[in-house]
From Swiss-Prot:
InterPro entries linked: CBM17/28, Galactose-bd-like_sf, Glyco_hydro_5, Glyco_hydro_5_CS, Glycoside_hydrolase_SF
Provenance organism: Halalkalibacter akibai (strain ATCC 43226 / DSM 21942 / CIP 109018 / JCM 9157 / 1139)
The keyword Transferase belongs to this UniProt entry's keyword annotation: no
UniProt-listed Enzyme Commission number(s): 3.2.1.4
Top-level taxonomic group: Bacteria
Catalytic activity line of the entry: Endohydrolysis of (1->4)-beta-D-glucosidic linkages in cellulose, lichenin and cereal beta-D-glucans
Cross-referenced Pfam families: CBM_17_28, Cellulase
Name the UniProt record assigns to this protein: Endoglucanase
Length: 800
């Protein structure tokens, strides 16, 4: 009770602060300065030329530095975006998206990230290749260069058998597009020590020699084929393409080969200098310095992937650091592609992701207008768009929102009628052409500020809906008339927290406020919370912010008929703090009997971040949360998934074979689809990702009563970790994630997790039963009681 009271007080304080802040405009930067004023190369894009102008690309030495030039020998810089994995996000391959990137973003390049492992090309070569071909064709049609990226990622050795199809793939693409100047071939995205699914390579000259051993024959094949005589080829470098310096020490013998640098501004610091002569490669540790070294030693560099987050895709965004990096790239005419064109819930994604109760995922098809509006872009996407265009970064105010309450587009009155207490009764209300038509207003003609009581009243008693308007500051509506006139409206929004609060005044629109609208005239009428205290009472209430009705007092000056449309609220988003139970220390097995979460938290990419609390399930404490899968499904079913994360410094598999836990469901709705439970570890030695190959599936259309325990559906989840073959028993796993993915389901409700633990293989040796006195009745085993007793004993041991 005390926690709930404190939470209410905190929410009330936040609401008051929001109201106060809304009274003052956002302060402009001091003296009108912008962040770009401190740099020389962030603004402008004169060198960002299109294929129709620049033609075939080539490498030349300009001002003592190898760089990319156009067919005329003039500098050219490619700026654009990389797709995410085409096996996961193929929806970006559409003409509307490409036109948005080419025209609105002013990109002159796109990178097609064709993963080979991780269910990519090696698993389904024909399908994935067809997507690459579609992406190439769209780029050519939209006058953009296109990087065909053979996305070496997991495993990190490009010589691994999973990548055996590289030479054939590039031969086929070159044959389809012989000597096409639009196409750039990227042979190895990120060679690294990542041994997830195969071998990795070291971060030294031995690692570069491995990359070179792989790349040399492909470069030779492309040149000898007659289909890629002069196309630019890009080759990755060790340590996730952070070592172009190693390539500069021993470059590939080819006239048009460049080398990659990849960086993430939250992980890779800038540097103003290279290295002293004769610095051993083992002492070259800064990514920007490695790039400077490569340029100084005669090779050309291309930043084919960079992000505004940390290297794992989360944290940030780090825009100040990004400005320093982009300044460096632009100053040195280094082309760049940002990661990535995805609505995945990661900071580096360009589009708004799905987050439960907060946002829906932006469609990767922007629609026929071929523009993603700023609200559809993530913070990173909005920033990168400005940097591609070379314009000032002016972020929108993302705290403002608009919610349409009544739009009348369905052809109905949406619950509106003449209010029972209206002093003017002969008003006819109907839907005409998608607006609410009010007729018979001749007798409702007081347009003064305070005498609205004499006017006609209408209300939405039959609406039957409820909308949360937390933080609302204004109520607006379109007033449509045959001829400009004066219309006066007062409003009483209603909801559980405010049934009736008299308006302070009526608000009017006058003839000069109207503008032509086809054969009529339209004005927008705005009622503030100061005009309608009821609006403020609902919007700023600490517990209930729902509106479920509205009473409007309508007066006109000589107009018998008016129309109302698009009744909506405008306000400021209020971030209500999520109150979790204490995190506690990371403990495995996790039994939660100490009242803490024992180290469990939401992963950064989790699509659900509701309150994690300790609740009772089957007689003992369990980690619990509420959520629901959305009706409109994103393309990535992990985007909406709750992702539990558990970090422990000494976390290893040991001799265990399974991760097991008790999982309980208390559904409000669960009639179709399934929940797919995945297990992931993030060991640094394996590229921060290993995934159990098998999952645990709960089919919601097969929920059975026998699975119920004390009103909850109970599942003993067991996921095999012995099948993860590329880790050892003593591999430091760092952290464990449990991911509850949506499979076309309608689940909504509360879930519980308990007794999370490693477990060995089940013992199969028979156990001899003890003899039982025939005169005694053997009591049945109460599993619930036994489990509770076990936990109490464990708790007592800890206390001792």
């Amino acid at each position: 009770m005390m926690l709930r009271k404190k939470t209410k007080q905190l929410i009330s304080s936040i609401l008051i602060l929001v109201l106060l802040l809304s009274l003052f405009p956002t302060a402009l930067a001091a003296e009108g300065n912008t962040r770009e004023d401190n740099f020389k190369h962030l603004l402008g894009n004169d060198n960002v030329k299109r294929p129709s102008e620049a033609g075939a690309l080539q490498l030349q030495e300009v001002d003592g530095q190898m760089t990319l030039v156009d067919q005329h020998g003039e500098k050219i810089q490619l700026r654009g975006m990389s797709t995410h994995g085409l096996q996961w996000f193929p929806e970006i391959l559409n003409d509307n998206a490409y036109k948005a990137l080419a025209n609105d973003w002013e990109s002159n390049m796109i990178r097609l990230a064709m993963y080979v492992g991780e269910n990519g090309y090696a698993s389904n070569p024909e399908l994935i290749k067809s997507r690459v071909i579609k992406g190439i064709d769209l780029a050519i049609e939209n006058d953009m260069y296109v990087i065909v990226d053979w996305h070496v990622h997991a495993p990190g050795d490009p010589r691994d058998p999973v990548y055996a199809g590289a030479e054939d793939f590039f031969r086929d693409i070159a044959a389809l597009y012989p000597n096409n100047p639009h196409i750039i071939y990227e042979l190895a995205n990120e060679p690294s020590s990542n041994n997830n699914g195969g071998a990795g390579i070291p971060n030294n000259e031995e690692g570069w020699n491995a990359v070179k051993e792989y790349a040399d024959p492909i470069v030779e094949m492309l040149r000898d084929s007659g289909n890629a005589d002069d196309n630019i080829i890009i080759v990755g470098s060790p340590n996730w393409s952070q070592r172009p310096d190693l390539a500069a020490d021993n470059p590939i013998d080819d006239h048009h080969t460049m080398y990659t640098v990849h960086f993430y501004t939250g992980s890779h610091a800038a540097s103003t200098e290279s290295y002293p002569p004769e610095t051993p490669n083992s002492e070259r540790g800064n990514v920007m310095s490695n790039t400077r070294y490569a340029l100084e030693n005669g090779v050309a560099v291309f930043a084919t992937e960079w992000g505004t987050s940390q290297a794992n895709g989360d944290g940030g965004p780090y825009f100040d650091e990004a400005d320093v990096w982009i300044e460096f790239l632009n100053e040195n005419n280094i082309s760049w592609a940002n990661w990535s064109l995805t609505n995945k819930n990661e900071v580096s994604g360009a589009f708004t992701p799905f987050e439960l109760g907060k946002s829906n995922a932006t469609s990767l098809d922007p629609g026929p207008d071929q523009v993603w509006v700023p609200e559809e872009l993530s913070l990173s996407g909005e920033y990168v768009r400005a940097r591609i265009k070379g314009v000032n970064y002016e972020p929108i105010d993302r705290t403002k929102y608009t919610k349409v309450l009544w739009d009348f587009n369905d052809g109905t009155k949406q619950g509106f009628g003449v209010n029972g207490d209206s002093p003017v009764e002969d008003v006819v209300i109907e839907n005409e052409a998608g607006a609410l038509k009010l007729s018979g207003l001749d007798a409702s003609n007081d347009v003064s500020e305070g005498n609205y009581w004499a006017n006609a009243r209408l209300s939405a008693d039959g609406w039957g809906k409820s909308v949360d308007i937390l933080g609302a500051e204004k109520l607006t509506m379109d007033v449509i008339v045959d001829e400009p006139t004066t219309v006066s409206i007062a409003a009483i929004p209603q909801g559980p927290s405010a049934n009736w609060v008299n308006p302070n005044r009526a608000i009017k629109v006058e003839p000069t406020n109207f503008v032509p609208l086809e054969d009529k005239f339209k004005a927008e009428l705005t009622i503030t919370s100061a005009d309608s205290p009821s609006l403020e009472a609902i919007a700023m209430h600490a517990e209930n912010n729902n509106i479920n009705n509205i009473i409007l007092f309508v007066g006109t000056e000589g107009a018998d008929v008016i129309y109302l449309d698009n009744i909506k609220v405008i306000g400021t988003e209020v971030e209500i703090p999520v109150v979790h139970d204490p995190k506690g220390e990371a403990v495995l097995p996790s039994v939660f009997e100490d009242g803490t979460r024992q180290g469990w938290d939401w992963a950064g990419e989790s699509g659900v971040k509701t309150a994690l609390t300790i609740e009772e399930a089957n007689g003992s404490n369990a980690l619990s949360w509420e959520f629901g899968y959305p009706e409109v499904k994103p393309s990535d079913n992990w985007a909406t998934a709750p992702r539990l994360d558990f970090w422990k410094s000494d976390l290893v598999r040991g001799e265990n074979d399974y991760v097991t836990f008790d999982f309980y469901l208390d559904p409000v709705r669960a009639t179709e689809g399934a929940m797919n439970i995945n297990l992931v570890f993030q060991p640094p030695t394996n590229g921060y990702w290993v995934q159990a190959p098998k999952t645990y599936t709960i089919n919601f259309d097969e929920l059975e009563e026998p699975n119920q325990v004390n009103g909850l559906y109970h599942y003993e989840v067991k996921i095999n970790v012995r099948d993860i073959t590329n880790i050892q028993d003593d591999t430091l796993l760092r952290n464990m994630m449990i991911i509850f993915a949506d499979v076309e389901s309608d689940f909504a409700g509360r879930v519980f997790v308990d007794n999370v633990r490693f477990e060995g293989a089940a013992t199969t040796e028979p156990v001899e039963p003890e003899p039982v006195d025939p005169g005694e009745e053997t009591p049945p085993v109460d599993e619930k009681e036994a489990k509770t007793e076990q936990k109490e004993a464990e708790k007592e041991e800890k206390e001792e």
